[in-house]
Amino acid sequence: MAKLTVKDVELKGKKVLVRVDFNVPVKDGVITNDNRITAALPTIKYILEQGGRAILFSHLGRVKEEADKEGKSLAPVAADLAAKLGQDVKFIPGVTRGAELEAAVNSLEDGQVLLVENTRFEDVDGKKESKNDPELGKYWASLGDGIFVNDAFGTAHRAHASNVGISANVEKAVAGFLLENEIAYIQEAVENPERPFVAILGGSKVSDKIGVIENLLEKADKVLIGGGMTYTFFKAQGIEIGNSLVEEDKLDVAKALLEKSNGKLILPVDSKEANAFADYTEVKYTEGEAVDPGFLGLDIGPKSIAKFDEALTGAKTVVWNGPMGVFENPDFQAGTIGVMDAIVKQPGVKSIIGGGDSAAAAINLGYADKFSWISTGGGASMELLEGKELPGLAALTEK
């Protein structure tokens, strides 16, 4: 990566501004999944060990009006982070700017941490965070000593005041360890993969993945398709899909992708289906691509798993984004499990999960430690897989 990293700058005695991704699920004031906090620890600890004073910024959820602030404070995160670091984390509830915040920042000593309140509290008055208000970026930058560390891959595809805005107003904007790893794994996999390189794309909508499919058809040796978007590809070929999910306005796109794929695009050959998405009374397996009338496909079948297993044999690089079925339901998780088994058994494979539902599937089904890398950013990893430049990354200082 041709950008400066946190190891390239002198941190001792400096007030270091750090954008982290602490956008974690919180229910009744309790964090239900702290993976993103854990992922940021190496960078935070490094800054503190080097004698820096860490000033952390993060958003939590969406905040559009005053009422949305309820339940969106980073207070539970501050407490969780303090426990993980084994030291106090300064935090002022509800405060994202002003004299009280400035006094707290200026009272920091070497090796101490302050977490600023949810950056999206600034969105209540004119979306200042989300629209990258220049005055806000300049103000937040003024709290530090000219060094900004971006370690929030999950928001790197957004141009916000707390990443791009601060970057524009500091002497050095550098990557943290998490951001560096994310870019190294995902970009390297797409731009310079060890071959054979197989991409697996699932999820419900073709529309979400058009750019990714187009880019990966150029870069990968094979692209396997599963999940709900399978049925848009099926219908584009005139195959009966029953009541399965379909994007009627994307049938031409699906057809065009199939035509230009030169056989690289591999689709399922059977389905596990039900007579309703949620309150179903009948589940059955259908041999062949067609789905029976009155039913909808909710997972790939055993022949598809075997076909994908064969396609993955010998793969040295695998990028997976999107489950094969409704994995949250035990009736429809066999496809996702089968594909994970097929990936992780390949000797010497570099296996990367592109965040989102795939990451949730690997974690919930006990496969997380079997993959080389699980991305912390769904949207950001999708844009990297699409070949796009990420604003948060572009704003960093060149080496």
Curated annotation (Swiss-Prot):
GO terms for molecular function: ADP binding; ATP binding; phosphoglycerate kinase activity. Pathway: Carbohydrate degradation; glycolysis; pyruvate from D-glyceraldehyde 3-phosphate: step 2/5. Its main location: cytoplasm. It is an enzyme of class 2 (transferase). ATP binds at residues 209, 297, 328, 355-358. GO terms for cellular component: cytosol. PROSITE patterns: PGLYCERATE_KINASE (PS00111). It catalyses: (2R)-3-phosphoglycerate + ATP = (2R)-3-phospho-glyceroyl phosphate + ADP. It is found in: Cytoplasm. Keywords: ATP-binding, Cytoplasm, Glycolysis, Kinase, Nucleotide-binding, Transferase. Its EC number is 2.7.2.3. It comes from the Bacteria. InterPro entries: Phosphoglycerate_kinase (IPR001576), Phosphoglycerate_kinase_CS (IPR015911), Phosphoglycerate_kinase_N (IPR015824), Phosphoglycerate_kinase_sf (IPR036043). The keyword Chloroplast does not apply. GO terms for biological process: gluconeogenesis; glycolytic process. Substrate binds at residues 21-23, 36, 59-62, 120, 158. Monomer. HAMAP family: Phosphoglyc_kinase (MF_00145). Belongs to the phosphoglycerate kinase family. This is Phosphoglycerate kinase. It comes from Streptococcus thermophilus (strain ATCC BAA-250 / LMG 18311). The gene is pgk.
